[in-house]
């Protein structure tokens, strides 16, 4: 494709871009030298790419990096963070002297970028995830904001071995994300040796083309070729573009360029000054280029009206699965705010997110069976507060995306996860479908609220609370139908449990959630007929846990607690309760949980086989009382 007249570049512009690239190299070398760690060679391979992107191609407001109309940039190869910080020194947002505090505890210029910095949308550094997040940003720009901003993602060639990269490539082409450009920094070298394809740019190109992408192979150190390729990419419709840049690690550094064993090593201090002087001698001007301003056409949005529009419609005793109640609540939530979106991994007819899709099809994203990418896409969609994202699949399959979820926490995201088909109550499908580790996983995530509703009414409240809660949330839903135990007027608060059965003569406090709460209620009724009374607590949120209610109830019942959960013992409800009462010497906790890998069977059979049915609760209560 020939360049249009306005895309032609003057020689002085090209020289300024090359000079900027070399200044970026110098900043990266000095910063990593100052902290005696970091990745200057990985920075040097992308210096021209970064110079062209930020000072020629991208449109953004220098003084407002978070502006909704700015082009987006994701540094998927997060170890090259120093050169990103160097860019913002050249832009004027960071003092050059601050670079010398790179990686120091009092400085936000960390070893890998995080959103502590206003110009970073998502944390990176765990490789292979940046493109998925960029897909979410691009999808939001094209389909929700319907805006002009574009998204650029810079990746390393080593990380292209990650399967999540190819999940993202498939997603982007399926949804025709022509506002997305992925840049492969093909510098040949990985951390401990060569990358698998080394400099075979033709293979990268064929693979990207096979995934439905428009492609350009360029010399990644030729600023004019880069400018032309980015301009061409902007003209392409209905396809994302992959720019495959042949580069050299450590470019511009004598005896280091394209040499192995320099990954993650700063330049020796006795050589650094000489290297910097050499690069400075290549710089012909101190001029800079002013980025083009963005096209301001993103809609102005508000999240303040994300409220429960009406009370739940369920009646006491109605039988409905919490997974179905989730779908119905989500559809209702979607009516209150047009920025509520839902992502699912080809399980919408099981998680019941299909109810939302039927009412709001334009806000439903089918991510197919690619859970890692689904989480990254949601992360991208939620950046800059553009959407309220719910992500649903079987809870067992969310474990596959634990690293993406972990990085979401580092990114300070507000994604809401919903995992269905939890525990042995899944039944005949067997252990591969049963989430028995999910509570442990989400409890370990910083600032993550963990909901475990026990009926349809509490599920609806959990959905609305999650939508309005800062940080990540996880809602655990179950497959079998359970009875509605709360009236429509019942109020729910994060961190407050419900004492749903009590008397003045209770002997034991039994704590459950989900299906085991209903087993506890059955046990309580049968025990009462035998003259034994127990207190039953519905936790509602596992994190934060209502320690006050638990301790008060335990002290009122002789210091005796029994926890019962459809989850492995490790990391579940029992351990959470034990932690909550750890400073109470007179309280004893007995845990009923799944203790081995289960098998197929009817839900009731499995609850009984693995010791968490009403029968086992009754036996545990009697044993406790007898002691």
UniProtKB/Swiss-Prot annotation:
Thiamine diphosphate binds at residues 42, 79, 125-127, 158, 187, 249, 263, 371, 397, 433. Substrate binds at residues 39, 263, 323, 350, 421, 429, 479. The record marks 39, 263 as: Important for catalytic activity. Its EC number is 2.2.1.1. Mg(2+) binds at residues 157, 187, 189. Keywords: Calcium, Magnesium, Metal-binding, Thiamine pyrophosphate, Transferase. Its cofactor is Mg(2+); Ca(2+); Mn(2+); Co(2+). GO terms for molecular function: metal ion binding; transketolase activity. It catalyses: D-sedoheptulose 7-phosphate + D-glyceraldehyde 3-phosphate = aldehydo-D-ribose 5-phosphate + D-xylulose 5-phosphate. The keyword Calcium applies. Pfam families: Transket_pyr, Transketolase_C, Transketolase_N. GO terms for cellular component: cytoplasm. Binds 1 Mg(2+) ion per subunit. Can also utilize other divalent metal cations, such as Ca(2+), Mn(2+) and Co(2+). CDD domains: TPP_PYR_DXS_TK_like, TPP_TK. The active site is at residue 371. NCBIfam families: PRK05899.2-5 (NF004559). Belongs to the transketolase family. Homodimer. Plays an essential role in total transketolase activity and cell proliferation in cancer cells; after transfection with anti-TKTL1 siRNA, total transketolase activity dramatically decreases and proliferation was significantly inhibited in cancer cells. Plays a pivotal role in carcinogenesis. This is Transketolase-like protein 2. It comes from Mus musculus (Mouse). The lineage of its organism: Eukaryota, Metazoa, Chordata, Craniata, Vertebrata. The gene is Tktl2.
């Amino acid at each position: 494709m020939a360049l249009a007249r306005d895309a032609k570049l003057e020689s002085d512009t090209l020289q300024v871009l090359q000079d900027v690239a070399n200044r970026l190299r110098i900043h990266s070398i000095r910063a990593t030298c100052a902290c005696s760690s970091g990745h200057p060679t990985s920075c040097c391979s992308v210096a021209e790419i970064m110079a062209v992107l930020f000072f020629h191609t991208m449109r953004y407001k220098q003084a407002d990096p978070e502006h909704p109309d700015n082009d987006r940039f994701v540094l998927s190869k997060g170890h090259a963070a120093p050169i990103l910080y160097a860019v913002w020194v050249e832009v004027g947002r960071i003092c050059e002297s601050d670079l010398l505090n790179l990686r120091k505890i009092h400085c936000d210029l960390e070893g890998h970028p995080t959103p502590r910095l206003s110009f970073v949308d998502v944390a990176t550094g765990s490789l292979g995830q940046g493109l998925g997040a960029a897909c979410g940003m691009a999808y939001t720009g094209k389909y929700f904001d319907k805006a002009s901003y574009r998204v650029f993602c810079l990746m390393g060639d080593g990380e292209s071995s990650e399967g999540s990269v190819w999940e993202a490539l498939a997603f982007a082409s399926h949804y025709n994300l022509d506002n997305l450009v992925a840049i492969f920094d093909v510098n040949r070298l990985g951390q401990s040796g060569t990358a698998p394809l080394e400099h075979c740019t033709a293979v990268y190109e064929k693979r990207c083309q096979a995934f439905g992408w428009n492609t350009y192979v360029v010399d990644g150190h030729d600023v004019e070729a880069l400018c032309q390729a980015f301009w061409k990419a902007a003209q392409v419709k209905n396809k994302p573009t992959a720019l495959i840049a042949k580069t050299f690690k450590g470019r511009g550094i004598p005896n280091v360029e394209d040499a192995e064993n320099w990954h993650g090593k700063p330049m020796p201090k006795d050589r650094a000054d000489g290297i910097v002087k050499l690069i400075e001698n290549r710089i012909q001007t101190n001029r800079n280029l002013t980025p083009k301003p963005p096209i301001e056409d993103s809609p102005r949005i508000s999240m303040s009206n994300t409220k429960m529009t009406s009370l739940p419609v369920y009646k006491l005793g109605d039988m409905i699965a919490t997974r179905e109640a989730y779908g119905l609540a989500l559809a209702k939530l979607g009516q209150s705010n047009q920025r509520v979106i839902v992502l699912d991994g080809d399980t919408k007819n099981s998680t019941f997110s299909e109810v939302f899709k039927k009412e709001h099809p334009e806000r439903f994203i089918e991510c197919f069976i690619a859970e890692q990418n689904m989480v990254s896409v949601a992360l991208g969609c939620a950046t800059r507060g553009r959407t309220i994202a719910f992500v649903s699949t079987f809870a067992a399959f969310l474990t596959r995306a634990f690293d993406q979820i972990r990085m979401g926490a580092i990114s300070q995201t507000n994604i809401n996860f919903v995992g269905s088909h939890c525990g042995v109550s899944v039944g005949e499908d067997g252990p591969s479908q049963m989430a028995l580790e999910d509570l442990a996983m989400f409890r370990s995530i910083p600032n993550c609220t963990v909901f475990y509703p026990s009926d349809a009414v509490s599920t609806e409240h959990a959905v609305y609370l999650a939508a309005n809660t800062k940080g990540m949330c996880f809602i655990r839903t179950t497959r079998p139908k359970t009875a509605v135990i709360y009236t429509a007027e019942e109020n729910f608060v994060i961190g407050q449990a419900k004492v749903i059965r009590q008397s003045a003569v209770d002997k034991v406090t039994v704590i459950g959630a989900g299906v085991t709460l209903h087993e506890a209620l059955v046990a309580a009724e049968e025990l009462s007929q035998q003259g034994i009374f127990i207190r039953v607590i519905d936790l509602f949120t596992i994190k934060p846990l209502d320690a006050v209610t638990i301790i008060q109830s335990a002290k009122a019942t002789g210091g005796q607690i029994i926890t019962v959960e459809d989850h492995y013992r490790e990391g579940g409800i029992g351990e959470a309760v034990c932690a909550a009462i750890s400073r109470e010497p007179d309280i004893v906790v007995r845990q009923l949980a799944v203790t081995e890998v289960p098998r197929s069977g009817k839900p009731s059979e499995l609850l009984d086989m693995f010791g968490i049915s009403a029968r086992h609760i009754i036996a545990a209560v009697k044993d406790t009382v007898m002691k």
